[in-house]
Amino acid sequence: MAKPNIICVDDQRDILATLKKELQFFREYVKIFYCESADEAENILDEIDAKGEHLAVIICDHVMPGKSGVEFLGEVNNDIRFQKTKKLLLTGLATHEDTIEAINKAKIDRYVGKPWETHDFINKVRTLLTEYILEEGIDYNEFLTVLDQDTLYTRLRNTT
């Protein structure tokens, strides 16, 4: 089976470099793409779909030139091909209203403020990946090293 995919979208190269460093932990188990715009990410979405692969998580900045992260994640949420994809919004400038809009419009699963604490960020990604793998019925045994054990235990306990 092909590795699940994660897409990271941020217009700031230093943030993408930080994401690349922090997500290194997952690289053996998932393919990770780094995009500087929503347009670039949309091309990756089409490639993933054309190959019939899983898009597990999108990590996206909120404030970007052109299409905002909320707009982009809203479009992904409305795209039947990726409705089960987990969405994490990164932002350093969001107001309370922005956050509410992101939850309502884009159905984000997690929110991380910039700057973030590395351990907390990795745990959020780990939890989202775990939820996706379980919801899609992917054999989780291949991914045990990178999955969130508490989420895995809770979900498996509730299904038996």
Each predicted region: which residue ranges?
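Two-component/phosphorelay signaling modules centered on CheY-like receiver
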Residues: 13-38
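CheY-like receiver
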Residues: 120, 125, 130-160
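Receiver (REC) domain active-site loop signature in two-component systems and cognate sites
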Residues: 64-65
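A Lys-centered signature of the CheY-like receiver
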Residues: 114
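Active-site residues of response regulator receiver
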Residues: 10, 61
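Hydrophobic/aromatic residues positioned on beta-strands within the core alpha/beta folds
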Residues: 88-91
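Acidic, metal-coordinating helix/loop segments flanking the phosphotransfer/catalytic sites
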Residues: 20, 36-57
